């Protein structure tokens, strides 16, 4: 099974559990 980087996965499918999400241009992270 080929693996891809977290960045590549996020680019294709959006953020996944465990990724840090920055809300718009704020300093809030989820």
Swiss-Prot record:
Compartment(s): Cytoplasm
Top-rank EC class of the record's enzyme: hydrolase
Record keywords, A-Z: Cytoplasm, Hydrolase, Metal-binding, Nickel, Plasmid
Transmembrane segment boundaries: none
Lineage of source species: Bacteria, Pseudomonadati, Pseudomonadota, Gammaproteobacteria, Enterobacterales
Name the record gives this protein: Urease subunit alpha
Subunit structure: Heterotrimer of UreA (gamma), UreB (beta) and UreC (alpha) subunits. Three heterotrimers associate to form the active enzyme.
Listed GO biological process terms: urea catabolic process
Conditions for induction: The probable operon is induced by urea.
Keyword Glycoprotein: no
UniProt catalytic activity: urea + 2 H2O + H(+) = hydrogencarbonate + 2 NH4(+)
Gene that encodes the chain: ureC
A molecular function GO annotation: urease activity
